[in-house]
A protein has these predicted regions:
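Short amphipathic alpha-helical coupling elements at transmembrane boundaries
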Residues: 2-6, 38-42, 55, 302-310, ...
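Hydrophobic alpha-helical transmembrane segments of multi-pass integral membrane proteins
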Residues: 6-38, 42, 56-59, 315-332, ...
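Alpha-helical transmembrane segments of multi-pass membrane proteins
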Residues: 9-21, 47-61, 87-116, 317-320, ...
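Juxtamembrane and boundary regions of transmembrane helices in multi-pass small-molecule transporters
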Residues: 63-198, 406-459
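Membrane-interface interhelical connector segments
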Residues: 70-101, 333-355, 381-385, 392-393
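Transmembrane alpha-helical segments in integral membrane proteins
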Residues: 113-127, 279-300, 367-374, 417, ...
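Transmembrane helical segments that form the transport core of multi-pass membrane transport proteins
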Residues: 170, 200-364
């Protein structure tokens, strides 16, 4: 990284914005900020600045994170409703998800340009030696360049291939173009900016892990070998998500079915176990990487042990959320003829907010992410509620549900689970409240912009 640029503003964009966007597209669930923040710390960033930058930037890629999981899986409570309408000429669940993804890009993309400029100004104002906004704002050309690098493939993929690959492809292509342009000085600020001497930093900026002062790094493998697993993941995902190639239908044909669950007729479920991203490509590439990186047995053991340890919390949360969603959906089946919980909430809020709801819908998604720790779980909990709100108010269901998905993405920056994880990896455990106080303002700004766009689309 030091060979590309020593300007901390540039490093924040490359690592905190672009690299984290790619990791979000591939893995999600809090991984990007937890990976990117220690990298910034190693480059000499104050721990507090590294944590806040990575949390805030991990927002617009999130709706398409983990190969589209927040939309493809998160909106699954709507699948029975949509499937029931297909016979009458209604759209399929897959078509609905694609349209929701398209609207998500329209709400997210403005922030892919606004947020970098704002955050660099924030960084130089609160963590710079001169305490000015202008030093960060002066890198606006580079921020616009980064926004174009990410947003163009992000938008194209969402509108052509669907909601699974926009962040992954946008981050991968954007990262390559951004690094290439940076090395050649394209839109790079003329002066190099830094945080100043460590001894002048405020004590609250640092934690138990000291920021690195190293300027040299000696790699233990080539760039090609380091990036090869990510490239293979991206290639396999693209090849298996294009229907015309036939791989998508073939992989989806392998199903694990559960019929008449617990003895109840008609209560069935199935899993396309080979089409799941966790199987192909992630598990497949994880096994291939052992050979590609010539990993030793102990390294392989440590990697898998760490992976399963990190999976515990999100797995438990997802199991609990799916069960809770089933209760929400089933609450409408009762002898008293009462509405389901989501529908009852929707009717009450529709009466209170009226036509102002599109301006507020994203904050519900953000609240869900704040509480549950995930955009996916937020969508699982509130997608049917948003659907019912749109039905009550006669708004486009796709737009209102998209605002929910976008809200879950922007909620990542205040999400308790993510904040705790980032604080742990940069040595700031105990400072979570201070960080949320800082990230709340970008969250509020994000929601205002999304609300304006949603209102424009609806009206």
């Amino acid at each position: 990284m030091q060979n590309i640029s020593r300007d901390k503003r540039v490093q924040a964009i490359i690592i905190g914005y672009m690299f984290a966007a790619f990791i979000e597209g591939a893995a999600g669930f809090g991984t990007p900020a937890a990976l990117a923040a220690p990298l910034l710390l190693a480059l000499g960033f104050p721990a507090m600045a590294a944590a806040i930058i990575c949390l805030v930037f991990n927002s617009f890629p999130v709706s398409f994170g983990a190969v589209g999981t927040p939309i493809v899986m998160g909106l699954s409570p709507l699948k029975p409703i949509l499937d029931a309408g297909v016979a009458d000429g209604g759209m399929t669940y897959a078509a609905f998800c694609k349209i929701v993804g398209e609207y998500c890009t329209m709400m997210h993309i403005p922030m892919a340009f606004i947020l970098p400029v704002f955050m660099l100004g924030f960084m130089t104002r609160f963590y710079g030696p001169n305490r000015t906004w202008s030093e960060g704002f002066s890198a606006w050309k580079y921020c616009i360049f980064a926004g174009v690098c990410f947003s163009v493939p992000y938008f194209i993929v969402a509108w052509t291939l669907g909601p699974e690959l926009p962040s992954l492809i946008g981050g991968l292509i954007g990262l390559g173009i951004l690094i290439y342009g940076t090395k050649r000085g394209f839109c790079v600020p003329e002066t190099t900016w830094d945080f100043g001497p460590h001894e002048k930093w405020d004590a609250s900026w640092t934690g138990s892990i000291a920021a690195s002062g190293k300027t040299e790094f000696h790699p233990h493998m080539t760039q090609f070998r380091a990036w090869l697993p990510y490239a293979i993941i991206g290639l396999i995902l693209v090849l298996t998500r294009i229907p015309e190639l036939g791989l998508k239908a073939w992989l989806a044909s392998f199903k694990l079915s559960f019929v008449d669950i617990l003895g109840y007729q008609g209560v069935s479920a199935s899993i396309d176990y080979l089409f799941l991203p966790g199987t192909i490509p992630f598990t497949l590439v994880a096994i291939l990487t052992i050979g590609l990186h010539s990993m030793k047995a102990n390294d392989v053991k440590d990697a898998w042990t760490t992976t399963f340890a990190k999976m515990k919390a999100p797995t438990i949360a997802l199991f609990a959320a799916v069960a809770l969603v089933s209760i929400f959906r089933g609450s409408g089946v009762n002898d008293a003829g009462m509405d389901s919980m989501p529908l009852a909430l929707a009717k009450t809020l529709a009466a209170l907010t009226g036509e102002a709801w599109p301006a507020l819908a994203s904050y519900v998604g953000g609240l869900g992410a704040f509480i549950t720790g995930s955009n996916t779980v937020s969508d699982l909990l509130f997608s049917q509620f948003q659907w019912d709100m749109a039905t009550q108010l006669k708004f486009s269901k796709e737009i209102i549900v998209a605002a929910q998905a976008v809200g879950g993405g922007m909620g990542n920056m205040i999400c308790i689970h993510n904040v705790v994880a980032v604080c742990a990896v940069v040595g700031l455990s105990g400072s979570e409240g201070m960080i949320i106080k800082k990230t709340f303002w970008p969250f509020l700004l994000y929601g205002i912009i999304v609300g304006i766009i949603a209102c424009g689309l609806v009206f």
